A protein has these predicted regions:
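Structural recognition of the beta-strand scaffold that forms the well-ordered cores
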Residues: 1-5, 56-60, 112-116, 160-163, ...
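Short secondary-structure boundary/capping segments
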Residues: 15-22, 72-78, 129-133, 176-180, ...
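A general structural signal for short secondary-structure junctions and capping/turn motifs
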Residues: 47-51, 214-216, 251-256
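Active-site neighborhood of glycoside hydrolase catalytic domains
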Residues: 91-113, 120-234, 244-247
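N-terminal catalytic cores of secreted or lumenal carbohydrate-active enzymes
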Residues: 1-112, 116, 132-137, 142, ...
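Aromatic/acidic polysaccharide-binding cleft in carbohydrate-active enzymes
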Residues: 222-284
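Short acidic/His/Gly/Ser-rich catalytic and metal-binding motifs that mark active-site loops
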Residues: 10-13, 65-78, 120-127, 171-173, ...
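Noncatalytic linker/hinge segments flanking ATPase motor cores
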Residues: 45-48, 100-103, 204-208, 235, ...
Length: 284
């Protein structure tokens, strides 16, 4: 179960218009914590855990906390392809996300992984923003994971790192792994190398090639495909056409890329038509 740790916001410094796309943070602006925040997401997580078939929680962040960003926002920089994580805040970001995960562990939640980065290659920012996100260049991905590994080592934590959840199998995905795997401390805590299977729905050859590379090179205990939906959503998720497409993609990713697990995006959203959500929830 992937749980999104929101980066928070200030109403007078917020460019994301859709309230479904900005998320309360458990950390206040002054650095104190309030775990009554984002209560409905926590409530949904609790309900799912009560079903008894979930043994692993992955806490992932689309953005650092808004106080740790250059813009004071979680929707990316004011220019495209610019990392919004303040260079002086890498350690703060690691402490913040690990603190939250450890709080839930103490409360009895089976948090096994933290994923600090989501789809680092995308532009995340500029004039048009729509959700939380943060761009990272490959070296910045490395620097971020190293800071998290250092903090986990300092705490002798049982938590493991997950990621970097590249947006596809192309672009910098292989470079991310090459950089991360070059550091012994990172690899001590990077239990799962994860990517998203976007952009190759009609190109099995790309998946075959990537799978061969992964089998030869990836040495982490797990290798996951952590997010996919049909993009663009030409079929509603309630339709048989959508089901057949998803079944094909699941099969291709398991067989050709050799992943250990496969996750869909997303369980619930607000749209009825051509939705990527399995369930629809309305504001009322």
């Amino acid at each position: 179960y992937r749980f999104n740790v929101g980066g928070g916001y200030e109403k007078d410094n917020l460019r994301i218009e859709n309230p479904w796309r900005y998320v309360e943070s458990f950390m206040n602006k002054d650095g104190t914590f309030d775990y009554s925040k984002d209560k409905y997401a926590v409530k949904m997580m609790k309900k799912c855990l009560k079903l008894g078939n979930i043994d692993t929680l992955i806490f992932f962040a689309n953005s650092p906390h808004f106080t740790q960003t250059v813009t004071g926002q979680t929707s990316g920089g004011f220019t495209e392809h610019f990392s919004n994580l303040d260079k002086s805040k890498y350690e703060d970001f690691a402490k913040y996300l690990i603190d939250i995960a450890e709080h839930f562990i103490k409360e009895g939640y089976p948090v096994k992984y933290i994923s600090p980065i989501n789809e680092p290659q995308w532009k995340w920012g500029g004039e048009s923003v729509w959700q939380e996100g943060c761009h990272y260049e490959p070296k910045e991905v490395y620097d971020c994971f190293l800071e998290f590994a250092k903090e986990l080592e300092k705490r002798k934590s049982s938590l493991k790192l997950y990621g970097p959840e590249s947006g596809n199998i192309k672009d910098h995905t292989k470079e991310y792994y090459k950089l991360l795997s070059s550091n012994e401390l990172i690899m001590k805590y990077l239990d799962t190398f994860a990517y998203h299977s976007y952009g190759s729905d009609e190109n099995v050859g790309e998946k075959v090639e990537f799978g061969k590379w992964a089998k030869k090179n990836i040495k982490t205990p797990r290798f996951d495909m952590s997010e996919w939906c049909e993009l663009p959503c030409k079929h509603d998720t309630k339709s048989v056409e959508s089901s057949l497409i998803m079944a094909r993609i699941i099969g291709e990713d398991l067989i050709y890329t050799g992943v250990d697990s496969w996750s869909a995006w997303v369980c619930v959203n607000q749209w009825d038509n051509y939705s990527d959500g399995f369930l629809v929830a309305k504001d009322d």
